[in-house]
Amino acid sequence: MHIKTLTVSQLNRYVKNTLDADFILNNASVKGEISNLKIHSSGHIYFSLKDGGSKINCVMFKSYAYNLKFAPENGMDVVALGNVSVYEKEGSYQLYVKDMKREGIGDLYVAFEKLKEKLKEEELFDDVHKKEIPKFSKKVGVITSPTGAALKDIINVTKRRNKGIELLIYPALVQGTDASRTLIEGIKILNKVEDVDIIILARGGGSIEELWAFNNEELAYAVYNSKKPIITGVGHETDFTIVDFVSDRRAPTPSAAAEIAVFDREVLINEILNYKYNIKNYMENIIKEKRNYLNLYKQKIEANSPTNIIVNEYKNIDNLKELLNMKIEGKLNKEKNNLSRLSSLLEAHNPLNVLKKGYTLIEDEGNNLITEKEALKKLNKINIIFKDGRAKLSIEYIEEF
């Protein structure tokens, strides 16, 4: 008997065609509990359906997911309607879900909600109990798997943000029967390390079963009673565990937890430089303002100082002196002009000027001016005054006209 050799692609295609031709598999109705739920940004929903003995991968494309009457969650019991086919690229078969109805709530989900309600009534979730996250931690304790992707993400974020931060790793189990015990032990030990400022409790994504260790009641009390603040970064953004509600801060991922715990050195330096610049400008403005006030007061003081008052009075005296001199000089000039005018007038009436024209004056011996001939009759001698001298004469006779 000759056996035909097939390529991988041919084999996967043959299996796919076989499954697609099966009536039952093309109209399958499968009951199970949702696990490992992922809602993609495209709108497609990826998850697994499981029961006590097995599980099958499922996908529900956006066009069908849009018609769902409820929001699927991990732990829900559902009945999924669709067809079973092969994803040729991976060689895996899965259920392509076209519709889904809620059947009931899974056992794990029931246990989760029951514990959540119990701890809520005990006020373990209240914000009043949340410890403040230190802004500038120097040493960060990390409780996680030493081989998991979560630790690598935390280390990478720490190196990127601040290489000076020390990480103290406590290697713990993050899933399985003993996981909760090792996580509790890690919290106790790191609380005894005096210089640990904050603790990160982390693991990567997984199904509700894989994350179940973080829904442990004793672990919840350990987180609540921790003296040091705890940040949880468990699973993906859509995953919520009990410790997320109890912790002092819940981060959607391990990387996000590291972003919160480790301050960015460059950002801090820039903030300090900005503060320095702002303080410098603030102080310069204050100094400038005070200097202006000082100059203003200085001007006022100088304006009212005795020295300035005396100087100003001296200036006033000088001005008055100059004004007085001007007035005196004006008065003198005026009097000079008057004197000159009177002198000219007097000169014009000076008898000597008449003598210059050939006339003479006659005086008696007492130098009294004689203007009539009758006065001569009583005199024997007279004085004759010329323009350039005088003569004494005797009267011999008087002739009348």
Swiss-Prot record:
EC number of the protein: 3.1.11.6
Any one cellular-component term (Gene Ontology): exodeoxyribonuclease VII complex
Short name of any one Pfam family annotated for the protein: Exonuc_VII_L
Assigned keywords, A-Z: Cytoplasm, Exonuclease, Hydrolase, Nuclease
Reaction catalyzed: Exonucleolytic cleavage in either 5'- to 3'- or 3'- to 5'-direction to yield nucleoside 5'-phosphates
Compartments in which it is found: Cytoplasm
Any single biological process term in GO: DNA catabolic process
GO MF assignments: exodeoxyribonuclease VII activity; nucleic acid binding
EC class name: hydrolase
Main location: cytoplasm
Family note: Belongs to the XseA family.
Subunit: Heterooligomer composed of large and small subunits.
Function noted in UniProt: Bidirectionally degrades single-stranded DNA into large acid-insoluble oligonucleotides, which are then degraded further into small acid-soluble oligonucleotides.
Name of the protein in its database record: Exodeoxyribonuclease 7 large subunit
Source organism of this protein record: Clostridium botulinum (strain Langeland / NCTC 10281 / Type F)
Taxonomic lineage of the native organism: Bacteria, Bacillati, Bacillota, Clostridia, Eubacteriales
Gene giving rise to this polypeptide: xseA
